[in-house]
Amino acid sequence: MSQSSTKNLGDLRVEIDSLDSEILELLNKRAAASLAVGAIKAGSSDQIFKPFREQEVLRGLINRNPGTLPSEHLEAIYREIISSSRRLQRPERVVYLGPEGTFSYFAGLQHMGRQADLLPKNNFEDIFVAVSKGEADLGIIPLENSLKGTVGQNVDLFMRYPVYIQAELFHSISHGLMTKGADISEIKTVYSHSKALEQCTGWLRANMPGAELVSVESTAKAAQMVAGSDETVAAVGHVKLANIFGLHVTAEAIEDLPDNWTRFLIIGPKPGQEGKRDKTSLLFTTPDRPGALVEVLSELSGHDINMTKLESRPALGEKWKYMFFVDLQGDLGADEHASLIEDLKARCLTFKILGSYPAGSQEGSKI
C-alpha cells in the first residue's frame, strides 16, 4: 500500500471517528428526550408501545433517506434506537410462543428490538393469559399464513380473553433442514411444527422418502430435540436455529412454495389509544336464522366499509353455531362510526372489536 493511499485511509478513519463522536452525542440527546417523555407518561395510563408513532418515524426517515445507506439498514438501526428509547421509559415484557428461536421469536426481535424482554411461553393460551392478567405488556402471535391459512386456535382465544390488537406484521417465512452433520440419506426422523412440515412436505418426500415426519410444539423445540439426540434426526425451521442449538444447516429454502408469508399480531391488554388506525378486526356471532350474516355484512357495505377478510369458526361449546372473524379497512373505533357499531351490535348475539390499528406493510420483510 502506497504512502498516499495509507494517508487517505488514515484521514478517512479520523473522519469516521469524528462522525461517531457526533452520532454518540446525538444519541444521548435523543435518549434524554425519551426519558423526558417517559416522565410525562409515568403519571398517566399511556402506553409505551406506540405502533403508529414508530411507523411514522420509520417512514419519515426512509422517505428522507438520500440512499447511501440502504433503507433496510436504516430501518434496522432505528428499530434498535426506538427499542432503547422504550426501555429507558419502562422495560417491556413481550411474550411469544417459545422456546427461543421460533418464528414468533424472530418476528418479535426484529420488530420490538433487542431491548424488549422477550419471554417464551409454552402455548398460545399462555400468551393470552399473560397479557390479559397484566403479567406481560404485549404478546406476539401468528394469525395466518399465506399458504396454510388461519391459525384457528388464536381466533378462538380472542373470544375467551380480553386482549386487543395493537399492530400487525407481515414476514416472509423460509425453512431450512438442520442436522448434527449427518447425510440426508441417514435421517430417519424429521421434527418440526405441524405447519412447517405441511409447508415443506413436497421437498421432504422427494428428498427423504423414508423419513418419519413428527409434529412437535414449535420449530425451536424441534431443533432443541435434535441437539440432544443422535445423528439420525433432523429439524425443519428458521436456519438461525442452527446457531442457537449448534446444528448444521443441511439444506436451505426447502418450502414447497417460495411466496410464503405469515401475518403476526401484537396484542395488548387494552385497545390502541392514538394515531392512524386504518384497519379494524371484529369477532361476532349472529342469531340462528336465515340472512343474519347477510344483514351484518349489508350494514358494513351500506357505510362503504371495505371488508378484506371473513372467516367462520365453530362457536365454542355451541353445536353447529359459528363465530365470524372480519378484517375491515378503516377505524371503526372513530366517533363517526358510533351509530354503525350500535346497529351491528343489535344484529349480533355477541360483538367484539378486537382492535383498530395501523395496517402493516403487505410487502413485509424477511425474518
What do the predicted segments below correspond to?
Residues 1-367:
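Domain-level signature for soluble enzymes in the chorismate/prephenate branch of the shikimate pathway
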